[in-house]
């Protein structure tokens, strides 16, 4: 027995034509694949807004020569240790580092961690990417 369900939807011609162009540009094999992704994205937005369980990555670049920055980064990560699964540290050059922090937990808490890191002087760029944890 299949877990897939079929259903029909009605859309205006302009909307479906625009959607078909999007599907082609993104390289989807079918409308169904594209719709599944859109539904997942919307459900993730809802989960995040409601403070649900999410997983993701915080990716940041920073200047490790900035005074006390490395110690502040470590302190903040320890303050949120229950959310952090792992970290990967990459030396980009003599001054710049890339850090990838894998996270899992309550969406608002992960956003607090991300914000606490982002505002530190010496952090050049930070991006938070979240996904469903289930």
From Swiss-Prot:
PANTHER family, sorted: NICKEL-RESPONSIVE REGULATOR
Cofactors named for this entry: Ni(2+)
Record-level Gene Ontology MF annotations: DNA binding; DNA-binding transcription factor activity; nickel cation binding
Positions bound to Ni(2+): 78, 89, 91, 97
Alphabetical list of NCBIfam families matching this protein: PRK00630.1 (NF001884), PRK01002.1 (NF002169), PRK02967.1 (NF002815), PRK04460.1 (NF003381)
Provenance organism: Chlorobaculum tepidum (strain ATCC 49652 / DSM 12025 / NBRC 103806 / TLS) (Chlorobium tepidum)
Sequence similarity: Belongs to the transcriptional regulatory CopG/NikR family.
Function: Transcriptional regulator.
Keywords: DNA-binding, Metal-binding, Nickel, Transcription, Transcription regulation
Protein's recorded name: Putative nickel-responsive regulator
Cofactor binding remark: Binds 1 nickel ion per subunit.
Entry annotated with the keyword Transcription: yes
GO biological process: response to nickel cation
4Fe-4S found in the keyword field: no
Superkingdom classification of source: Bacteria
């Amino acid at each position: 027995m299949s877990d897939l369900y079929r259903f029909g939807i009605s859309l205006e011609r302009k909307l479906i034509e625009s959607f078909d162009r999007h599907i082609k540009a993104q390289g989807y094999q079918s409308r169904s694949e594209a719709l599944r992704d859109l539904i997942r994205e919307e459900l993730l937005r809802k989960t995040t807004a409601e403070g649900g369980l999410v997983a993701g990555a915080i990716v940041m670049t920073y200047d490790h020569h900035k005074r006390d920055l490395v110690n502040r980064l470590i302190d903040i990560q320890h303050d949120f240790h229950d959310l952090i699964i792992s970290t990967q540290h990459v030396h980009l050059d003599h001054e710049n580092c890339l850090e990838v922090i894998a996270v899992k937990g309550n969406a608002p808490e992960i956003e607090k961690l991300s914000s606490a890191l982002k505002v530190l002087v010496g952090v050049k760029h930070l991006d938070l990417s979240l996904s469903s944890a289930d």
